[in-house]
Amino acid sequence: MKIANGQTVIQLFERWSPKSLAVEGDKNGVLIGTLNKPIQRVLTALDVTESVIDEAIELGAELILAHHPIIFRPLSSIRTDTAYGRIIEKAIKHDLTIYAAHTNLDITKGGVNDLMADALGLKDIEVLAPTTTESLYKLVVFVPHTHTDQVREALGRAGAGHIGNYSYCTFNSKGTGTFKPEEGTNPFIGKQGALEFVEELKIETIVTEGQKNKVVAAMIKSHPYEEPAYDLYPLANEGETLGLGRIGYLHESMTLEEFAKQVKKAFDVPTARVVGSLETQIRKVAVLGGDGNKYMAHALRKGADVIVTGDVYYHVPHDALMDGLNIVDPGHNVEKIMKQGVKEKLEKLLKDKKYDTEVVASSVHTDPFTFI
């Protein structure tokens, strides 16, 4: 079996959901333990409670990948005679590593908010509250004609060359490369001390900030030269906008009451708080996992008929109603959708690299509320 170590697991995860996406002041990354160990099993969880710790121990998971940080505010002490202290003590005693992916997982493509939008069947989905725009880079590499297809394929597989809904986009131009292999080299073409003239193809493509290291590594691995010549430089073009929340359209309009029932079914919750006339027709829907109180204005500006979010304060709906915005609040816990979503994504990332590390979604229910 090929088992990934903790560093590898998190490197793969952060290529998809980099910590750099997180909002300022957020707590992300390793909060307890170390990544310097083999990881046979990863447990994905929304919250880290004592029951989740017990589940990880029972399953033999060495790493808990959670959405909500177990440590959010600075600690002045860790008292093992308190419930919170016992959780930390138990994690350390059983050599568990706890990693949090909070707002970066909300923001990243395919993360919490995309999972929520997909669960509701939305189409024409956009970002609700932009936080950043991806930086773009131009990668230029010079390849002998014998290996151009191989290098182009490696670039595309690594994610380079995406422009809108087009992939594998490159520009190719012919030219002549020159080089003289010096002492200690093992040239693919030519011999030491002799100036070589080689017909080469210049392949140009576009990569994002988050992709560039992976793409360059794939290019170097596929290139026949021991020292490939390439350029990587930033572009003034702006890449894709990333941010919190999503907004899109239902495939067909329905009443607010019908939509609220759909929300309950999609997120498997027993109840939802609804703000607005139940007969109102709903077509354009905003979603924001977690606490969406600060994002009502974003939903209004983008023309949403309703926003689906959690933890709505008492006075916020009064303003929303005056502005004509309906609200469905199924609770904060609907972010539990990330457990299965992250499991499937991380599982694929590991399998693509031929690792046998297992990923398990937590079965522990961590919603503190009971509905009667």
Swiss-Prot record:
Stored Gene3D superfamilies: 3.30.70.120, NIF3 (NGG1p interacting factor 3)-like
For this record, an example GO cellular component is: cytoplasm
Q: Which residues are noted in the entry as a divalent metal cation 2-binding? A: H68, H332, E335
Molecular-function GO terms, alphabetical: metal ion binding
Q: Does the keyword Metal-binding apply?
A: yes
Q: Where does a divalent metal cation 1 bind?
A: H67, D106, E335
Family named by the database record: Belongs to the GTP cyclohydrolase I type 2/NIF3 family.
Subunit (UniProt):
Homohexamer.
Please name the NCBIfam families in this protein's record.
Answer: YbgI_SA1388
Can you say what this protein is called? GTP cyclohydrolase 1 type 2 homolog
For this protein's source organism, the top of the classification is: Bacteria, Bacillati, Bacillota, Bacilli, Bacillales
